[in-house]
């Protein structure tokens, strides 16, 4: 995809050290965006940024934990000062703590929400203040199709992603008068380390693709998992000029797993 209006834009990306976040960083960088890569893991983050620089891309590493609002405010100010005005924010950082509701600990519940929901709030609030002053910007939150479909052992994850989805829509409504667009990309099962950690072997992926009446899952009509690049391409579209009149939209990228509902 040759995206309109991405070259030279500064993109703040959380969770950029691996998986979907890394794919988003690489995809936007390939279109000429300048990447402010944010992640709590400094070693992995530096590897991604070094790789991008070796390819001739513009990228800088900003290690930070999205759960820490003061740290995110500080990083946002640094990016504005050292790289320039932030044009794009992509909230990707996320965690998955599976478990039946009565087996979930307080820590597991709170840890899930602190990253998947509060982390989105912290980064969005911090960055959007600068965007409001300029009356320009685009924010995309990577949610999950689990936010709209009940799943066993996924209560914490699904609920936290549902909160992030609705928060982003509310943010989009409040920021519309400032010409700031806010959208969501909701992946289904995707080939990431986080996804593979749920399965004992490759049969896990096959079962997800097939579906199961016992677990109330419909399967994936396209008969394959998403690749991180599939999600990144959807993000690219929503932050580009091609999506200039789209806001508060939830784009589901799940191979039809939620049957378009």
From Swiss-Prot:
BP term (GO), one: cellular response to iron ion
Cellular compartments annotated: Cytoplasm
Enzymatic reactions: (2S,3S)-2,3-dihydroxy-2,3-dihydrobenzoate + NAD(+) = 2,3-dihydroxybenzoate + NADH + H(+)
Pathway note: Siderophore biosynthesis; bacillibactin biosynthesis
Active site, renumbered: 157 (proton acceptor)
GO molecular function per UniProt: 2,3-dihydro-2,3-dihydroxybenzoate dehydrogenase activity; oxidoreductase activity, acting on the CH-OH group of donors, NAD or NADP as acceptor
Record-level GO cellular component terms: cytoplasm
Name of the protein described by the UniProt record: 2,3-dihydro-2,3-dihydroxybenzoate dehydrogenase
Source species: Bacillus subtilis (strain 168)
Origin organism lineage: Bacteria, Bacillati, Bacillota, Bacilli, Bacillales
Gene designation per UniProt: dhbA
């Amino acid at each position: 995809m040759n995206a309109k209006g991405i070259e030279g834009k500064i993109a703040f990306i959380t969770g950029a050290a691996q998986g979907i976040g890394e794919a988003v960083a690489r995809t936007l960088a390939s279109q000429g965006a300048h990447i402010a890569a944010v992640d709590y893991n400094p070693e992995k983050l530096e590897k991604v940024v070094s790789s991008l620089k070796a390819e001739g891309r513009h990228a800088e590493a900003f290690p930070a934990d999205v759960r820490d609002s003061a740290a995110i405010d500080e990083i946002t100010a640094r990016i504005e000062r050292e790289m320039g005005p932030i044009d794009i924010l992509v909230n990707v950082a996320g965690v998955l703590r599976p478990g039946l509701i009565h087996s979930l600990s307080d820590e597991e519940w709170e840890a899930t929400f602190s990253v998947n929901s509060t982390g989105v709030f912290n980064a969005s609030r911090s960055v959007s203040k600068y965007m409001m002053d300029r009356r320009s910007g685009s924010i995309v939150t990577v949610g999950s199709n689990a936010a709209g479909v009940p799943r066993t052992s996924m209560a914490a994850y699904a609920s936290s992603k549902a909160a992030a989805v609705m928060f982003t829509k509310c943010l989009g409504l409040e920021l519309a008068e400032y010409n700031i667009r806010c959208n969501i990309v909701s992946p289904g099962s995707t080939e990431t380390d986080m996804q593979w950690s749920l399965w004992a072997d490759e049969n896990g992926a096959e079962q997800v693709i097939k579906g199961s009446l016992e677990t109330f899952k419909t399967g994936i009509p396209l008969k394959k998992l998403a690749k991180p690049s599939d999600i990144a391409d959807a993000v690219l579209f929503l932050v580009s000029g091609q999506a200039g009149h789209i806001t508060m939209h939830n784009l589901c990228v799940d191979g039809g797993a939620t049957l378009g509902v």
